[in-house]
Amino acid sequence: QAEGIVGGYEANGGFLLASDVTRGGQTMKALPTRDAVLPILAILVSAAQRGCTISDLIDDLPRRYTASDRLKDFPTELSHARISALSASVVDIEQTFGGLCGKVSATDSTDGLRISFENGEIIHLRPSGNAPELRCYNEAASPGRAQALNEACLSVLSAWR
């Protein structure tokens, strides 16, 4: 983690680096195009610097699991409107999703609406960038919980049509 460094990931493995990064006197220029090699190199370098295997790096990570799906034929304008309305109030968010996850700890509207809950779970809603779809991404402490949360969220979102 570094202050002022901007990077972004795609579910398909693409990575975008929007900032120059300097480390050990070497500068890597911003990479404003999708690239899947950079994350692989970062993992290999990290393992080499720590003198451990990639499996060891993975073992040090917190256990987090994701699930995602989308509602097809959901107009982009409607996605934006619904997400914007929900973003306006933590009370509204908790009324909508609190029964699933409890109290909200943080929200981020950088890319749609990412809602973090005190129990550590995450609901991230955003319109698709290339289709009339409303996407829902979830994070939880187990694969089953992530999938169940995703299905429950999609049920709630279906009522937004």
Regions found by a protein language model. Give the residues of each.
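Phosphate-binding and adjacent anionic-ligand microenvironments
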Residues: 1-129, 133-135, 140-161
